[in-house]
Amino acid sequence: MACCHKVMLLLDTAGGAARHSRVRRAALRLLTYLSCRFGLARVHWAFKFFDSQGARSRPSRVSDFRELGSRSWEDFEEELEARLEDRAHLPGPAPRATHTHGALMETLLDYQWDRPEITSPTKPILRSSGRRLLDVESEAKEAEAALGGLVNAVFLLAPCPHSQRELLQFVSGCEAQAQRLPPTPKQVMEKLLPKRVREVMVARKITFYWVDTTEWSKLWESPDHLGYWTVCELLHHGGGTVLPSESFSWDFAQAGEMLLRSGIKLSSEPHLSPWISMLPTDATLNRLLYNSPEYEASFPRMEGMLFLPVEAGKEIQETWTVTLEPLAMHQRHFQKPVRIFLKGSVAQWSLPTSSTLGTDSWMLGSPEESTATQRLLFQQLVSRLTAEELHLVADVDPGEGRPPITGVISPLSASAMILTVCRTKEAEFQRHVLQTAVADSPRDTASLFSDVVDSILNQTHDSLADTASAASPVPEWAQQELGHTTPWSPAVVEKWFPFCNISGASSDLMESFGLLQAASANKEESSKTEGELIHCLAELYQRKSREESTIAHQEDSKKKRGVPRTPVRQKMNTMCRSLKMLNVARLNVKAQKLHPDGSPDVAGEKGIQKIPSGRTVDKLEDRGRTLRSSKPKDFKTEEELLSYIRENYQKTVATGEIMLYACARNMISTVKMFLKSKGTKELEVNCLNQVKSSLLKTSKSLRQNLGKKLDKEDKVRECQLQVFLRLEMCLQCPSINESTDDMEQVVEEVTDLLRMVCLTEDSAYLAEFLEEILRLYIDSIPKTLGNLYNSLGFVIPQKLAGVLPTDFFSDDSMTQENKSPLLSVPFLSSARRSVSGSPESDELQELRTRSAKKRRKNALIRHKSIAEVSQNLRQIEIPKVSKRATKKENSHPAPQQPSQPVKDTVQEVTKVRRNLFNQELLSPSKRSLKRGLPRSHSVSAVDGLEDKLDNFKKNKGYHKLLTKSVAETPVHKQISKRLLHRQIKGRSSDPGPDIGVVEESPEKGDEISLRRSPRIKQLSFSRTHSASFYSVSQPKSRSVQRVHSFQQDKSDQRENSPVQSIRSPKSLLFGAMSEMISPSEKGSARMKKRSRNTLDSEVPAAYQTPKKSHQKSLSFSKTTPRRISHTPQTPLYTPERLQKSPAKMTPTKQAAFKESLKDSSSPGHDSPLDSKITPQKRHTQAGEGTSLETKTPRTPKRQGTQPPGFLPNCTWPHSVNSSPESPSCPAPPTSSTAQPRRECLTPIRDPLRTPPRAAAFMGTPQNQTHQQPHVLRAARAEEPAQKLKDKAIKTPKRPGNSTVTSSPPVTPKKLFTSPLCDVSKKSPFRKSKIECPSPGELDQKEPQMSPSVAASLSCPVPSTPPELSQRATLDTVPPPPPSKVGKRCRKTSDPRRSIVECQPDASATPGVGTADSPAAPTDSRDDQKGLSLSPQSPPERRGYPGPGLRSDWHASSPLLITSDTEHVTLLSEAEHHGIGDLKSNVLSVEEGEGLRTADAEKSSLSHPGIPPSPPSCGPGSPLMPSRDVHCTTDGRQCQASAQLDNLPASAWHSTDSASPQTYEVELEMQASGLPKLRIKKIDPSSSLEAEPLSKEESSLGEESFLPALSMPRASRSLSKPEPTYVSPPCPRLSHSTPGKSRGQTYICQACTPTHGPSSTPSPFQTDGVPWTPSPKHSGKTTPDIIKDWPRRKRAVGCGAGSSSGRGEVGADLPGSLSLLESEGKDHGLELSIHRTPILEDFELEGVCQLPDQSPPRNSMPKAEEASSWGQFGLSSRKRVLLAKEEADRGAKRICDLREDSEVSKSKEGSPSWSAWQLPSTGDEEVFVSGSTPPPSCAVRSCLSASALQALTQSPLLFQGKTPSSQSKDPRDEDVDVLPSTVEDSPFSRAFSRRRPISRTYTRKKLMGTWLEDL
């Protein structure tokens, strides 16, 4: 028929599933509206899907128009479901408008728009219209008129562009970035509806409508709606319009409520007029779809005059012209222009609904022809009314002599108001009032009229109250139902619509029906069937709604994650791939063994499909039928109920006519219904009590009645009825399941009753009865049945096992293996699983062959620990191996394992899959190759439990843990001891001789009692407290355990033979890599010796307290800080050593030394976090020395051991980072890091990123600054502290985020003033020392501090030669007693100190100060001096770190604020605690990292036992390098920990071992471009100095002396950014040992830092050195070939080693931050970052490195700098830098303000950092490269200091970029990227202005100075 309307729905699927319900509802509402308007037969529709983002979609199945009907709608829904799935696809190049236009064109051309109907067009339609028949033509005309000519329509269901920006993107797509101007309407029209499309639409009478499906949240957040109105305007030209989606679903008010409920924060809460919800949806659609003149004629507009109140002093009354449009067709129209007089305002007015008071409503608007000013005023009035929720009271003069009418004006929208005119039916009322008013004098008219208004309003309220009270009472159930829905409005029918088809009757309503039926007293006569039907319906609806919500929730969660995140799965995510494969294979094998039939029940799929608490519909229907015999009755009193129940009970028992379970169910439900009808609170509890008191009998009471009952059948029947009653109780009162005790009692009682049945009858009868119970209740209460079977001791039947929740068996793992006493019963025996007695190896072999042969019919069975989310108790299963077998097979326990060659571990990992099955089959000789610990498995208790009770009895007493240390379960995961024991006790039987079940959290005391060195004790302690279940990846834990046990066994030997481990340069440099034992031994020995002297008391304090403090700090970033701390320490040591041996060292050595110094600073700088933390650590330790001293005398000692200056530098920041709590330095940094993270992820990120960078920067700057300060002291000492403070102040704001970076240079106080300053302010340094700064504070402080520290580290080396020489002298001279050292330190640092004093904050934290005032070199230097002093104490500090760190660390944050005095205090404290060391360290730090190192070395040499010696050891002792190497794997943290532990030993060792064997390492550039390490034996005396230096370098820089190791670390970090995060130590290792460890890094990055970072890192630091921190080091060494591979590319990829770390950090910073959250991770990142630059330097080699470094200074902070690095061949570094920069920027974006501070810091720090890094990266790296064979160093022979200086200062380094210009450029770059970031903070601007100079000066001058010093 010609009059048939064709409707096309064109749906955009780009929005995804989020819009599914919105689109569905809009389509359904639209079709319903059209079918109501034209008739079902007159509307034919089709639908088409397209993707406006360009994703390809399959063609729609429906190819032509169809009639409206359920079938076509079902097709639509099906297609919609399939299309609107969440799928990831990137937007294509073409804009959305193009795709939309293409889809529209296809729609117009592909469909038959004008095809006539099949029925004859001439046949008239018999439709009565009045009294005539309509022919086709007249019908068509009428139809056209009906909807304003609407014949055919296309409805586009897609999000409509709202803002101008969205419109631009819609039209231009990817080009929107380049195009700045908004598109003109013409452009939009040409893109969307070009002329050809419009012509086709006109020809086919098609109107185009756009149904906007934009999400609410986006709608409210849109800045403007210009795009929306532009589209509206365009569509109006063709007769169409935009239809808001709320027209089809909810009103605005509801939408607003939904938004608020969903937690979406709107910038401003939307003010929605109640009128919007009053208007029916059909009215809205009519208005939108009708454009015909006829429609508008139904609502004629008229003009009116709005008279505003007369203002005082004005005689003329202002008037506005308005238009009035009736809202309804039936209301009376005014006859002439209406006059409206405003009288006042009223609040809380609602539309009256009184029957006596009628209302007419008119829409008031401002006419288009009125002046713009008036329109604006009108809109302001409307918005004011809306905002204040006011209404205006007005008099309306209708004219024609009629009296004025009272009206109320309410806001409707932004430009319209509603005038509601009250018209009463009694006209007399108004007449009377008016007559009275006329009678009165004119003066009284106003007041009288106000009285009239009041009286009218009062009457309105009275009438409302009357109608409310008079209204017939609404039934309670109806009110309840209405209460569950939103308030019903006049559009109630419209509102019901969206719910009726989707939800049906609500569960609340059905529950009310049940109540109605149960509560009505006069329904006795109602049929039994009807009552049962209502009851069953109610139950069905309620259960169905529950099931739907459950399934929907499960589907949602399924969509969110593909696989369940079980604890085991999460744990395995941290493992290396081979281990992961091994564990999955092992667990799945066990699952296969448990379910050989391949039933996938174990996978937990059935748990999802079954609703634990609900019966299926079929079962309900069955029950409904059975119930009809017992009618639920209505009882008035409880007595009636009880008598009925007892009568029923006795009748059932006596006659047996009624089915027992039906009777039981009926009785329980009757009681429940009765209590419900009484409105009982706690219904289920009361119901249970009622049933227990009146119905339940115990088996004891039944037995006592046995004598009375002669009838055995009655007795059995009663027992069965009691069983059913209890089961029904569990079913109908689910609350009983929540109480374990109640459930146990019920199960116990049922068990007793069943046993009575079995005794009375026989087991076969019982089996039959159990089958019946199973059939009835398996779907509803499977867990109860499972418990029942367990209680009876029966094997759980297969069908029940399949239904049980997946976590059922992990609670009682023995259920399926239990021997059943009733195995003779057929149904039981058939279901029982056979228990295989064959050894596990046979089973594995059998499984292996079977799985290979078997076809894949069934889905892979996954082990519960992998497949199930709910896992109650995890255990460690340790296979019990007899001692004999162990001996035979050479499977030695952990203690001996360290002696194994590293290759063993490699082989084990490599052959992991094969060994899984072959382990038992290997010959003893082969097995000896992998005599690692028997792998401990964390599995569900279900696995591999066999009944070998005989053997167990023999072996039970002999079970011995093969693992000496088991990581402590994190507090938040710990199960109460009582519950744990109860669970284990509740297991049906002992696991058996094979399996030892170890509780997850063994007593801590056991660990302590183990005989081991203090350092190891700390390590194990921290390990015990580590947050990870497996300290790291399993491989690592094995190696660590091996080392650990080995160390335990050999701890004494180690003490005696520290040197013995250093046999050759190779072992020295790569010992940790090649031999787990020797490095660890070395470290252990060194550590032990030192720890005995200094660390013995300190280490325990630091590391023992760490348990708690570590945990606390770790809670933030425990691991990272520690690592960072250690790393800083190592660097500090290195500097000392370097300083000490610079003079003695050859240029190469010096370079190496420098590098190592750099490295030490670079660690902080390389890995921003590291540097941040390290500096902090140093500061903290120094500063902490004081605070710690106050806090823990022991710790202070340690701190003393560690350079106070260093401590302040590192420690303070560290403190800030970690928390005063963390005992170990590393921990504190972590804390601070964690704290910032806590403070705000973004800020943390910024701090972490920027801070890492900033830290790095700052660290560098600080180090540099220290150096600079030395240099500057001479050159710029004059620069007042105030100046520095100013600088600091400028930077501070930025420091807020990365306070460390820029702010640190600034005066700490000022910093505190700034965001960082604020933090600092919160806890002044002094205060900080005592109190831990707030997390934020710590964070900010940390950044500041660490930069200082880093700077001091770096700076010291470059520091003025005099200082260097001074330090050297100090180094050379045996360290004076602590007091002397302190004095010396003070002397050395006096200028700095004075500076520090001038800048209390800066001086307070030498490191911090430096960081604070990188710009103020003098201050920095002073700080650095302090730091230098501190460096010597680093070893001590290490020991001290834990406790001291905590205080210091916090203090360090305060330190920034603290005055010089504090610094002095720290120094003095350091002195007290090994001031000699501290002093030397501090001095070395002050003069330069080299000096510091030298000092430390000297100390170590002079006083092997003195803390100073530890510092020296750390930096310079050969042992230390070994350990460093060892640490490398772990990362700087390990290194630091090693140093801390080894410092005394190391120093001592360096003294001892240095003389016996000293090696000179030179980096040589080969033609291939790879660096070559040349190791020469050196004169023992010089060697002593040089070696300690190199060692310190290697340990400190891990790049200088152990360049190879250091590099590999870097490379590792590079190769595995994740590892970097995972285990900062690893990254560091990677960086340090790219050559050898590099490959490992990739493989082993599984340092398991994931855990390590959070909790392991601290252990790493602590035990990282002695233990093999990561599997990397421990067992798997990369083949030499791989190690020797050029790493340039990889480094670049990874972010250029340290760069990589940085890059990784930067690129992954967001993620990295989260990773960094774990202390270790943060540290790792920083380390990795620091290391990475070194790697790149390796690659740069030679001169290239220097230039590279130089630019990197800026480059690190800036992309430009990065690019300059790239120019030098540091492309990788550049990438890293860029990545990091990007990450930083991302962080900045996240937190602009913070970022700004951070950026400024980062930038300022960056320059200084880069300068610092430069020395560290450029010089140090060059040296490191030289030192490290793997790195490719361009320097063939050692560069002379002068040559290096020349290179450094060469313009080539800056290639057209002055350092200042470079820094500017980078800054500019930054600004471009984040203009707001840069410009937001004046500080950052100021800093940027200054920074270039300081940076330039720092970089060039510092480098020159540094070189000269060297």
From Swiss-Prot:
Residue numbers bearing the Phosphothreonine modification: T1134, T1307
Quaternary state and interactors: Interacts with TOPBP1 (via BRCT domains); interaction takes place in a CDK2-dependent manner. Component of the replisome complex composed of at least DONSON, MCM2, MCM7, PCNA and TICRR.
Basic and acidic residues composition-biased segments: 545-558, 595-608, 616-632, 1001-1010, 1275-1289, 1489-1500
Region (Disordered): 545-568, 595-632, 833-859, 877-905, 981-1012, 1027-1453, 1488-1523, 1580-1637, 1687-1709, 1746-1766, 1796-1830, 1850-1877
Modified positions (Phosphoserine) in chain numbering: 292, 441, 599, 820, 838, 865, 923, 938, 1001, 1026, 1057, 1078, 1125, 1141, 1413, 1484
Keywords carried by this UniProt record: Cell cycle, DNA damage, DNA repair, Nucleus, Phosphoprotein
Name the record gives this protein: Treslin
GO CC entries: cytosol; intracellular membrane-bounded organelle; nucleoplasm; nucleus
